[in-house]
Amino acid sequence: SRKPAVEGERWYASSPWTWDWDAEIAQNSSNIDSAFSTTENRSTGILRNSINRQNTYGLISKLNYDVSDELEVQVGIDWRTAGIEHAREVRDLLGGDYYVDYADDNAPDGKVVRLGDIIAYHNETTVDWFGAFLQGQYDTEKINLYGMGGISTIGYTYKDFFSVEQELVEAPSITTFQVKGGGRYNLDDRLSAFANVGYVQKPPILDNVIDYDGNVSTNPDNEKFTSLEIGGEYNSDLVAIKGSYYNTQWKDRNLTKSVTTGQGDSGDTDIIYLTGVN
């Protein structure tokens, strides 16, 4: 059995503790539960693995084109699709013959599982991403300018194999864009000034769009990053000095919280999607 490292003290979650493995194995090895089997021993404690199986396919391609000696243009695309299976499985029955898992809604009275069987949860998610960008750079002896713009779209799906419906939940695609630009001006051979600005949108992660029960957040806000940098640089044969001011802001952060109100569809729990957190 699990015991606190210091006798008489109580602990929660990740805390100092010891486990009497011999006692657990002895208990599992002589535990007949006639509700499930009259000949095999039921394990009340086991070891389990958390598994995450992922298959990802994609294509990244870009094209460089020199418009002139001073101007270079680059265009690119980024396509990726991923399927991820999330589950837990029985790793060791610790002396018993089987374990009873109650997580599958398709077996409300308990499901007999053995070594390697899925327990606790079993779901599959997909992430489909496509992006494109255009970038240009203009470079002369006195001035250097660059700019880029990009757009991307991402879509999520979720399927819970432990639910009765086993419905494929699909969230609407989310579109984001970003723009960045900057430049450097050489005042003379040693002194230069520079500035950079940027605006980037980041889509919410899957967990902030589709929750564990398959509920979908409609029109979630993209997270937004803005940045500004201005500065100067001086270089000589003896010394190099660089100074700059940098500011970045992160707005519309997304969070998902469960609260107990008694007003949710289940009668006791609501899922609240918090957007616009600054």
Report the location of each language-model feature:
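Transmembrane beta-strands of outer-membrane beta-barrel proteins
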Residues: 1, 74-78, 146-150, 196-198, ...
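Residues that define the transmembrane beta-barrel architecture of outer-membrane proteins
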Residues: 53-57, 126-130, 173-177, 224-228, ...
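Outer-membrane beta-barrel channels and translocator barrels
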Residues: 68-70, 140-143, 186-190, 225, ...
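Surface-exposed loop/turn segments flanking beta-strands in extracellular/periplasmic regions
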Residues: 5, 9, 17, 21-39, ...
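Surface-exposed extracellular loop regions of Gram-negative outer-membrane beta-barrel proteins
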Residues: 153-160, 171, 185-229, 240, ...
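Signature of Gram-negative outer-membrane beta-barrel scaffolds
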Residues: 46, 72-188, 203-205, 209-213
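Membrane-embedded beta-strands of outer-membrane beta-barrel proteins
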Residues: 59-61, 132-134, 179-181, 218, ...
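Outer-membrane beta-barrel domain signature, strongest for Gram-negative TonB-dependent receptors
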Residues: 1-82, 240-242
